[in-house]
């Protein structure tokens, strides 16, 4: 933020808000970069800058775990039931993200290739399915990512595939949410490794969709906001292909007792911080804020904002 010429303009705009919320890391980052140059003061979560009082608090958004369980449970559609039967002896790594450069899909493919390279004992016994529906198809950069993934999927399958075994399935299409929850439930590993993500609710949905008696394992990027809450996931650096590959191997070989323990810890957090709690807590705190007597005005321009060296 400090590298932006308009840093102080943005800071002033944010400070006009009475209650600033999001993730703990973002709240801390905002104050770290703003405080030295704003001439502002703060005590605990209460702050004062340019004569305006405001508060920072952390409200990580949640999901509806009960609804996820309902969608994930019950009989499978005929085609999915048939697929599950065909793959009963195969461990499934599953991932679903919109086609976006921030999701780290090329890096994810490279990490899976590293798994096949360093842990050949899994050959013929695992399958990685990546669903990535098209996003902003008219933008050239997104077209390039799509073509890159198609090329990488073909190359990896050509290098490691066998008769009767295709190691990587890449699907560039939309799937119904209810169907995805059912796929989550029978997946052995959920791979969620964005390069940067404010929260990533897919990680929480994967955990909520699992069978508590035989849950899958979540491999999660340290740069996803959800990693602050889901600390019992296997947390990885998505830029380190070998680290992600090692985590995938750990997930595929993890004993049932450890899987149950990790899942229970994450599910407890998800249920405690569900969408209803998120909404109620934020609204309650917002109502507790004392209204300002004077109307807040946005800065007219950024001419007073000095450039940073």
Predicted features by range, described:
Residues 1-309:
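Catalytic cores of carbohydrate-active enzymes across secretory and cytosolic contexts
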